Amino acid sequence: ITGQHVAGLPCVLGHEGAGEVVAVGPQVTAVKPGDRVALNWVPSCKTCFFCERDQHHLCPVITRRIFTGYMADGTSRISRSGQPILHYSGISTWADHMVVPEECCQILDPEVPYEVAAVVGCAVATGVGAALHCGDISPGDSVAVVGAGGVGLSAIMGAALAEAGQIIAVDREPSKKHLSIDLGATHFVEADTDAIGKVIELTGGRGPDVVI
């Protein structure tokens, strides 16, 4: 944490959310009123240099603009007493209603509840994405996931999807064990013990193939 990314003030915070589309702008084609959507706080234009190489998180066209507190067109859609209020991560989910770029909207399966869908936009995308796209996990690999919070638990699920043979969850809080195991971990190690030694022991003295 360096403090290099500082949100401007005043702003409406919140970067995870889901809800129902109630209205759309005249040029919107991806969603319509009544659609149930999860919100993605790192949208992409899908046509730039990085997007064409499947590196959507590096897209400069939309992402860099929204980090300044404005919409993709450089304007704010929130105001109070005639004064603009900045957006946060392009979606500002701590509000009853939000104005977001259509690129942020991911249409939901009707059976997915909003409280589950809300965390998909950051915690799940980050953790599962780390396992599937950054970890380069091969079937049968041993994987250690350090931290079993929302992102870590999602990484555990991602490692399971990648068919890792051994998934070791490491966390300071013993109460995280059962949920970690339920979501795919094969072992749980308390971080306040000799965690490194135990992980090495569990992997036959070799250490894990992948650490997240």
Where in this protein do the model-derived segments appear?
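Mid-domain Rossmann-like dinucleotide-binding core that forms the NAD(H)/NADP(H) cofactor-binding site
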Residues: 96-97, 103-105, 109-193, 197, ...
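Glycine-rich beta-strand-centered segment in the early N-terminal region that forms part
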Residues: 2-52, 57, 65, 107-111
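Phosphate-coordinating loops and pocket residues in cytosolic domains that bind phosphorylated ligands
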Residues: 53, 61, 182, 190, ...
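Residue-level signature of the cytosolic catalytic core of signaling kinases
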Residues: 13, 90, 110-112, 191-192, ...
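NAD(P)H dinucleotide-binding glycine-rich loop of Rossmann-like/cofactor-binding domains
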Residues: 6, 47-146
